[in-house]
Amino acid sequence: MDGGGAHRTPEDVFRDFRARRAGMIKALTTDVEKFYQQCDPEKENLCLYGLPNETWEVNLPAEEVPPELPEPALGINFARDGMDEKDWLSLVAVHSDTWLLAVAFYFGARFGFDKESRKRLFSMINNLPTIYEVVTGTAKKQSKEKTPKTSGKSNKSGTKPSRQPEPNSRGPKMPPPKDEDDSGGEEEEEEEDHENTLCGACGDNYGQDEFWICCDACETWFHGKCVKITPAKAEHIKHYKCPNCSSSSKRARA
């Protein structure tokens, strides 16, 4: 986002925030193997940047002083080999959340947001789970605590695979839509339950018309598009592991 002469709204800044956030979540989840390799402790001070096009990059800090935008935490690569991987990723996630807020409110100040505009911006930001919550699985736990799972319902799905496997089956899973034969109150509860399901890659909520798949290792739900799994591919997967669990297993065997 550039300064420009056009009037900017909290919604404009929030779109920038959300795009940068999506990129950083990808780095710490679906692209974690690539991110881990790029954070070589032998290199100079490296930073994780979230970009406005929903991608990420690991790079050196800006050379200009002061920088055009607030800078993310320096030297995230130095702690990589001295910490447990999950703890290191959690630390990077915390610093990433801090940086995103700094950038958002930098734009807010630059565009002259008043009290109400700042409040609206923060409210939109606060409605999303933090990167830390997504990376550590806290967002998923909070969602479960907020809306208890309903039981005794048929689990039909509008996308393939045609049904959600039973707990002991090995196939990939998807959040089931509401049962049309249930009462209206139960339908609303089920719908709210689904809406509170968060993608482990992008952190967005479940949508009824979207294909989702569940990792059999960490039991985290993902948009199929976020982990590059289509309904056709899912039909042939007996035991699905998300990119994060797959890469962790590879490093454990190395």
Curated annotation (Swiss-Prot):
Principal location listed in the UniProt entry: nucleus
PROSITE patterns on file: ZF_PHD_1, ZF_PHD_2
GO molecular function terms listed in the Swiss-Prot or TrEMBL record: histone binding; transcription cis-regulatory region binding; transcription coregulator activity; zinc ion binding
Protein name: PHD finger protein ALFIN-LIKE 8
Function: Histone-binding component that specifically recognizes H3 tails trimethylated on 'Lys-4' (H3K4me3), which mark transcription start sites of virtually all active genes.
Domain notes per entry: The PHD-type zinc finger mediates the binding to H3K4me3.
Transmembrane segments: none
PHD-type zinc finger locations on the chain: 196-248
One GO CC annotation: nucleus
Species this protein is from: Oryza sativa subsp. indica
Cysteines engaged in disulfide bonds, as pairs: none
Region (Disordered): 137-194
Key words, A-Z: Chromatin regulator, Metal-binding, Nucleus, Transcription, Transcription regulation, Zinc, Zinc-finger
GO BP annotations, alphabetical order: chromatin organization; regulation of DNA-templated transcription
